[in-house]
């Protein structure tokens, strides 16, 4: 996931092409403009300019991934006949992902057919996925949409996951991990005496919204099914290594998920 206003586009072109080559064409490319005004300002970016910078940086990135020489004249970035020596293995470029929760950005993602991932309660994400699908349906045949090489976009929802042999063990691990995860998410805001996002990421909110899914394989399987059904998504993005979870806990969680949860969702 690259916050484009924080990167020099020409260097990013080279990094993306190299990553796709090294991974054998398995790179999935997430792009965004950033949601924290404090983070943007730390990099010398005016939050008011982040939308325009994102649009220009994305145009430069995609041009550089698909052309032999790069020329671009914008308000924020300018390049003149720059040779591009390395290109991605996937053509024309790796599939694009766009995480968002604002109506305008959701329409933008759907219009271009970006793979999309939403946050928050499944019911709220359902509104977003419905809006995405409307935009996608209206623009799927547009010749100039940016993710045109992706025939069926992934419409995802993000969840933090802990699977253990017993429900109580999974809950204890999730509670402990969440304390540090919460501090890391809110730290920069708190340094500016801003607590406006605390409620979005509290343990109580996570339980209410099912943004953290924990339990035995049976419990997690049921929760995953409910999330997928209620959200209208066709893809669930799971994070197994977060907060203070040890490598052993994360690997055990992932193993249980793969062996005892995923088979229930096999499609053929």
What are these regions (language model features)?
Residues 1-268:
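Active-site-adjacent structural elements that line small-molecule/cofactor binding pockets in enzymes
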């Amino acid at each position: 996931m690259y916050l484009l206003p924080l990167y020099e586009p020409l260097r990013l072109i080279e990094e993306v092409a190299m990553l796709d080559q090294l991974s054998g064409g398995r790179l999935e490319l997430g792009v965004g403009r950033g949601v924290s005004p404090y983070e943007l300002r730390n990099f010398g970016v005016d939050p008011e300019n982040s939308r325009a910078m994102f649009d220009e940086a994305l145009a430069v990135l995609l041009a550089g991934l698909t052309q032999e020489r790069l020329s671009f004249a914008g308000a924020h970035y300018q390049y003149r006949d720059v040779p591009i020596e390395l290109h991605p293995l996937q053509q024309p470029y790796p599939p694009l992902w766009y995480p968002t929760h604002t109506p305008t950005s959701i329409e933008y993602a759907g219009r271009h057919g970006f793979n999309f991932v939403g946050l928050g309660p499944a019911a709220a994400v359902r509104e977003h996925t419905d809006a995405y699908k409307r935009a996608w349906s209206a623009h799927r045949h547009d010749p100039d949409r940016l993710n045109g090489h992706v025939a069926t976009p992934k419409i995802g929802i993000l969840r933090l996951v802990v699977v253990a042999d017993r429900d109580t063990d999974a809950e204890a691990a999730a509670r402990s991990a969440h304390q540090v995860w919460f501090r890391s998410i809110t730290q920069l805001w708190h340094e500016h005496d801003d607590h406006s996002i605390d409620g979005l990421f509290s343990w109580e909110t996570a339980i209410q919204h099912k943004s953290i899914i924990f339990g035995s394989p049976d419990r997690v399987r049921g929760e995953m099914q409910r999330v997928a059904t209620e959200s209208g998504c066709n893809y669930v993005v799971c994070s197994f290594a977060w907060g203070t979870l040890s490598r052993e806990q994360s690997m055990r969680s992932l193993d249980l998920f793969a062996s005892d949860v995923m088979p229930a969702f096999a499609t053929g």
